[in-house]
A protein has these predicted regions:
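Interhelical loop/hinge segments that connect adjacent transmembrane helices in multipass membrane
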Residues: 1-23, 128-130, 189-199, 205-252, ...
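Hydrophobic faces of transmembrane alpha-helices in multi-pass small-molecule transporters and flippases
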Residues: 10-34, 136-140, 166-167, 209, ...
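Small-residue-rich hydrophobic transmembrane alpha-helices
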Residues: 55-106, 149-157, 275-328, 370-377, ...
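Short membrane-interface helical motifs at transmembrane helix boundaries
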Residues: 103-133, 324-353
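Alpha-helical transmembrane segments of multi-pass membrane proteins
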Residues: 126-151, 346-372
């Protein structure tokens, strides 16, 4: 495996090097977390805000569902692109995936199909459905642009150029701002369409920028001698990648599950009202953990030569994230966040406290999960990751059913208990699996 620039070729890997490698990736996830609220804030300041916010939310959800199978292309290129032939093989696979998701988007906006989705299936009012159709049409190139971008981002991460990934995200947000402002001032488009156009243009510009920024890394890929190693085949890529794609799709079930059960719980309105606020706060501290998966893939090494250093950095970041979150949730800062920052009235701020406090260990568990996943990715055992994700979602469903259906708990509290329980099941499953396999780093942190 080609060693990233952030990793010294010999000896140990300094924890400070790992942290500097991780920092721009974490910043990228933080900026991406801000993207949704940012677009929503733009739409909220335009005419017919309620209809357009609803329409944008539906259009984004549809596009996100279509896009989910290509989310792991960054991980795939980080793990698999070691030379020129593997680059060409995975690029061919990426193009095919992009063509497939674009075809699905095109089919989805065909009038008969779209009416079936938004009318028969979702029951949207006609005025909202029309706005959704226009916004979804604008988002047709969005999934493929994300796939293209993530393919080249993975190559940059592998070569120790994680900062360039963050630069691309900044460029995307700037493009979104310019597009939204220009269209709001000089076009007749509705807010939902302007939000979709801002989102699509930002990702397209970032995709082009990622290709340009990855140019030197691609040029540096070695050409192996004939017969030096077996080439990376399309069949091998599919075998490696389809469990990762399935993992992304399964993960999407969590949100609807929480919403479904909370709507049937005690205090459903209050639970649904505080859910996005609590989740947003916790994700601020989880986002660095999501980014840590790419750190593990890039730096642990194919044979696990840097596993101890990466595990040490993992412990520092994981416990640090949960301790800082606890410092917010178990002090007066909690009310400052929920009331002054998030704008919740005092009764809902009080209501949000217990569900949020239950999730205090979720950031640490996110880091642990990313570290565990990275080791299985390096060994090519991606099916184990899919099984762990399915177990997590199944655990969430079972705990929700038990807490709400049998114990009559408040929905928000049950939701937090379910998320912690599901994640713990996933962590423990991967811990157990690592003990019986040869994933890199099995002797450290499970």
């Amino acid at each position: 495996m080609h060693a990233p620039e952030a990793s010294p070729p010999d000896g140990g890997l300094a924890v400070s090097t790992i942290l500097w490698f991780w920092l721009p990736l974490a910043a990228t996830w933080l900026m991406m977390a801000a993207e949704g609220p940012y677009v929503a804030a733009i739409i909220a300041r335009m005419p017919d805000a309620a209809f357009n916010l609803a329409a944008y939310g539906v259009a984004f959800s549809l596009a996100w569902l279509v896009e989910s199978p290509i989310m792991m292309l960054l991980t795939a290129s980080n793990a698999l692109v070691s030379d020129r032939p593997s680059f060409l093989a995975l690029r061919r696979f990426t193009y095919r995936m992009n063509a497939a998701v674009t075809a699905v988007m095109v089919v989805a906006i065909l009038p008969p199909v779209f009416r079936g989705i938004t009318g028969s299936l979702m029951g949207l009012p006609p005025e909202v459905a029309r706005l959704v159709h226009a916004a979804t049409a604008i988002l047709v190139p969005w999934p493929a642009a994300i796939g293209y971008r993530r393919f080249y981002q993975g190559i940059m991460v592998r070569h120790g150029q994680a900062r360039r990934v963050a630069y691309g995200t900044v460029l995307r947000l700037a493009t979104m701002s310019i597009t939204a402002a220009t269209l709001a001032l000089a076009s007749p488009l509705h807010g939902a369409s302007i939000g979709a156009a801002a989102l699509a243009s930002g990702v397209i510009v970032e995709a082009v920028a990622s290709r340009v920024m990855a140019r030197k890394a691609v040029a540096a890929l070695p050409v192996p001698a004939p017969g030096a190693a077996a080439p990376l085949t399309q069949r091998a890529i599919v075998r490696f990648y389809y469990p990762l794609a399935l993992t992304s799709i399964i993960s999407l079930v969590t949100g609807p599950l929480l919403t479904f059960f909370m709507g049937r719980s005690r205090h459903p309105i209050e639970s649904l009202a505080v859910l996005p606020v609590v989740q947003s706060l916790v994700f601020l501290f989880r986002s660095g953990g999501v980014a840590f998966q790419e750190v593990g893939v890039a730096l642990i090494g194919r044979s696990g030569e840097h596993r101890r250093e990466v595990a040490h950095a993992l412990r520092l970041l994981a416990w640090g994230a949960s301790i800082v979150l606890a410092g917010v949730l178990f002090t007066p800062l909690a009310h400052v966040w929920f009331q002054r920052v998030s704008g919740l009235p005092s009764d809902l701020a009080d209501f949000a406290l217990l569900p949020a406090r239950i999730l205090v260990l979720l950031p640490a568990m996110e880091y642990w999960l990313s570290y565990q996943r990275s080791r299985f990715i390096l060994s090519g055992q991606t099916r184990v990751i899919t099984a762990a994700t399915a177990l997590e979602v199944g655990g969430i469903a079972l705990v929700l059913a038990a807490c709400i259906g049998w114990l009559g708990m408040i929905g928000a509290v049950a939701g937090s208990l379910a998320q912690i329980s599901g994640r713990l099941a996933s962590n423990l499953f991967l811990f157990t699996a690592s003990r019986s396999t040869r994933a890199p780093g099995t002797d450290t942190n499970g």
